[in-house]
């Protein structure tokens, strides 16, 4: 199968937005106009193509980032009538699913940032924007819902500038706003575009309406000044009053978008079919192809020596698995991005992280959840493979003869957990397998068991996250389960540095056990997890026993000394020890490591940590005092407040333990007129009174 379009004509994009900005509807319209869809799906009637899980259709929110592909020939600009392939990853807007956004952004080249013309920049827009900044993803802005009462394109653009610190440059302005939204003025061509009232997909080009001439000139000057600032040749022409051509404006706008210095801003109403075609033209015109993004870097599996791969079919194959999904018909699907080379169906790939070779049974390109078989996939493609058994999210797939490890994805730790138990014996057998499959798909979902109670615990990023997963157990895996009350995922760490000896000796006739280790424990900065340093000199602890010492320490870290919670952010250095020729074994050194760590942790000023959430509440002014008082009573710290879109907002840092059931309280406190978002911020030390209560509750089970 030959390549359908050249690599320079491929666009890998995501549509990123706050929940309710019209993201799924916009994606539906893209598929409709590019000929992939014959009937438009609406989110509010549960018919949207990209929202393919049952819960998504019911809740009207997108949970999993489905990937789809389509073709588009721009109707104007520097790429007019050239066939392009657009691969779209639809990303969720709900804060509990930020992991989906994170992994999508990792494999994208560009993004369309969607904003609501009424709400402007919402809290989740900020979260997603920060994630996109982290990966330096070039963006265009599309202000949607221009037909809504209260729509204000200029206020939305101002909010993008002020709240996101970006440089949005309108390349269109609206003709009418709200119910009288009729079309746009194209500032590059200085023409008016009026959409057909009924359909919106047809339009006519007109002269700029008389009452908008002054405004259009003002915004065209704004655009020309913005592009002149990033290009010296254009600046000279502009200052000397020479004409700047359309092609020149587009070329410099493209360069500035690719380097992140400008965000071209457009507007429309996806629901009313107005503006989507011009947004597609802008995707082609301003967002990068894999060629623009350039080489991807990684390292050799055996060492840290750097390797790069050019985006070319002639390079060795390298791809990144960014999502695992279970398909009811073909089983496990591994979504991956091809960075270089060609991969054929039926061939073998190396998982560079595990060292295992696996056969790719089938290759598919997805249109939402419909599949199209492919004989081969090429550099720049996003596709799904069937038949890969041991691949996890973030693994590198590559040519076995030319291995490379691409940068891994880092996912946040879960902050909330609940106990789950099967309703019947039949469910019991299926529960473990089903939970395992869900954990494979979602790196922020963890399954563990409480050794004392024997309960199965599931952990995730929020109440909605776990609710959706329990719902999937029932629908997809036909497993009925009861769930307990949500529990906070507390952690422990140390504040001091100490040295300690761990000794395990058993002499009871015959072969005994002997292991002695001297370790130093010290705190690491938050989020670093665990670090082990082997500083043994002269073989006082034989090399073969050193991994066992680390294993024993990690075992002990699962059960901290304050209240039995997992320990994090600790560095342990093994610097001395003793062994016995006959009695020493891996087991004796593992136990010595465990004893040593427990003893050291007790002396190293151990503390209990709790997850702190970043909470933002948007409320009518009359409830502001009540909302702030309530947040303070929840041990919250008010970080800021202000006005947005006619309402007040409050930002606060609040312990997760105090936020269960908050939505119900907020609803009754404000007659349902306020809403809030919440995301994990950091782990902080628990106040003494709370720590004592938790210790009492746990019976300080870790202190034995």
Curated annotation (Swiss-Prot):
Gene3D superfamilies: 3.30.230.10, 3.30.70.240, Elongation Factor G (Translational Gtpase), domain 3, P-loop containing nucleotide triphosphate hydrolases, Translation factors. GO terms for biological process: ribosome disassembly. One of its GO terms (molecular function) is GTPase activity. InterPro entries: EFG_II, EFG_III, EFG_III/V, EFG_IV, EFG_V, EFG_V-like, EFTu-like_2, G_TR_CS. Residues 8-291 form the tr-type G domain. This is Elongation factor G. Catalyzes the GTP-dependent ribosomal translocation step during translation elongation. During this step, the ribosome changes from the pre-translocational (PRE) to the post-translocational (POST) state as the newly formed A-site-bound peptidyl-tRNA and P-site-bound deacylated tRNA move to the P and E sites, respectively. Catalyzes the coordinated movement of the two tRNA molecules, the mRNA and conformational changes in the ribosome. Its main location: cytoplasm. Pfam families: EFG_C, EFG_III, EFG_IV, GTP_EFTU, GTP_EFTU_D2.
């Amino acid at each position: 199968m030959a390549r359908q379009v050249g690599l320079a004509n491929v666009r890998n994009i995501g549509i990123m937005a706050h929940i309710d900005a019209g993201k799924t509807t916009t994606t539906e319209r893209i598929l409709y106009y590019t000929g992939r869809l014959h009937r438009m799906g609406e989110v509010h009637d549960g018919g949207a193509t990209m929202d393919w899980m049952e819960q998504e259709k019911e809740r009207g929110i997108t949970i999993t980032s489905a990937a789809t592909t389509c073709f588009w020939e721009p109707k104007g600009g520097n790429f007019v009538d050239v066939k392009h392939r657009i691969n779209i990853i639809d990303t969720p807007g709900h804060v509990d699913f930020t992991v989906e956004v994170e992994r999508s952004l990792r494999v994208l080249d560009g993004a369309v940032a969607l904003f609501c013309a009424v709400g402007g920049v919402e809290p989740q827009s900020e979260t997603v924007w920060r994630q996109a900044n982290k990966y330096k993803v070039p963006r265009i802005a599309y202000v949607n819902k221009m037909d809504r009462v209260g729509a204000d394109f200029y206020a939305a653009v101002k909010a993008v500038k002020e709240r996101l610190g970006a440089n949005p440059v309108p390349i269109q302005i609206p003709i009418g706003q709200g119910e009288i939204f009729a079309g746009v003025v194209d500032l590059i061509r200085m023409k008016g575009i009026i959409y057909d009232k009924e359909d919106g997909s047809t339009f006519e080009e007109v002269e700029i309406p008389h009452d908008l001439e002054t405004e259009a000139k003002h915004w065209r000057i704004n655009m020309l000044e913005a592009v002149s600032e990033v290009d010296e040749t254009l600046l000279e022409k502009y200052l000397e009053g020479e004409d700047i051509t359309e092609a020149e404006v587009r070329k410099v706008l493209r360069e500035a978008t690719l380097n992140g210095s400008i965000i071209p801003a457009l507007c429309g109403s996806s629901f009313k079919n107005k503006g989507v075609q011009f947004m597609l033209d802008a995707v082609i015109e301003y967002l990068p192809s894999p060629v623009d993004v350039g080489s991807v870097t990684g390292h050799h599996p055996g060492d840290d020596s750097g390797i790069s791969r050019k985006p070319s079919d002639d390079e060795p194959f390298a791809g990144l698995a960014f999502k695992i999904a279970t398909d009811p018909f073909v089983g496990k699907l591994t979504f991956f991005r091809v960075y270089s080379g060609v991969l054929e169906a039926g061939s073998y790939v190396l998982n560079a992280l595990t060292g295992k070779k696996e056969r790719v049974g089938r290759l598919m390109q997805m249109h939402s959840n419909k599949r199209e078989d492919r004989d081969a996939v090429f550099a720049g493609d996003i596709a799904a493979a069937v038949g890969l058994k041991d691949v996890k999210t973030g693994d590198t797939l590559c040519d076995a003869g030319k291995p490379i490890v691409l940068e891994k994805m880092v996912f946040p730790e879960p902050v909330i957990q609940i106990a789950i138990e099967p309703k019947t014996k039949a469910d019991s057998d299926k529960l473990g397998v089903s939970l395992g499959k869900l954990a494979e798909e979602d790196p922020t979902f963890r399954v563990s068991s409480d050794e004392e109670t024997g309960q199965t615990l599931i952990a995730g990023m929020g109440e909605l996250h776990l609710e959706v997963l329990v719902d999937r157990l029932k629908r997809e895996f036909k497993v009925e389960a009861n769930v307990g009350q949500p529990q906070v995922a507390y952690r422990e760490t140390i504040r001091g540095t100490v040295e300690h000896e761990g000794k395990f000796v058993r002499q009871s006739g015959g072969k005994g056990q002997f292991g002695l280790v001297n370790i130093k424990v010290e705190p690491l900065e938050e989020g670093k997890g665990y670090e082990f340093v082997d500083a043994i000199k002269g073989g006082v602890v034989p090399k073969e026993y050193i991994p066992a010492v680390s294993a024993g320490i990690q075992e002990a870290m699962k059960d901290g000394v304050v209240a039995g919670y997992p320990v994090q952010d600790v560095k342990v250095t093994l610097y001395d020890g003793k062994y016995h020729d006959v009695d020493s074994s891996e087991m004796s050194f593992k136990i010595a490591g465990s004893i040593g760590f427990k003893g050291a942790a007790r002396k190293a000023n151990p503390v209990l940590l709790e997850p702190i959430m970043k909470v933002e509440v948007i409320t009518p002014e009359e409830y502001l005092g009540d909302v702030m008082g309530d947040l303070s009573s929840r041990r919250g710290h008010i970080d800021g407040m202000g006005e947005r879109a006619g309402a007040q907002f409050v930002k606060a840092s609040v312990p997760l333990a105090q936020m269960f059931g908050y939505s119900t309280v907020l609803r009754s406190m404000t007659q349902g007129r306020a809403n809030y978002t919440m995301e994990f911020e950091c782990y902080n030390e628990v106040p003494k009174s709370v720590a004592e209560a938790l210790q009492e509750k746990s019976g300080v089970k870790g202190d034995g």
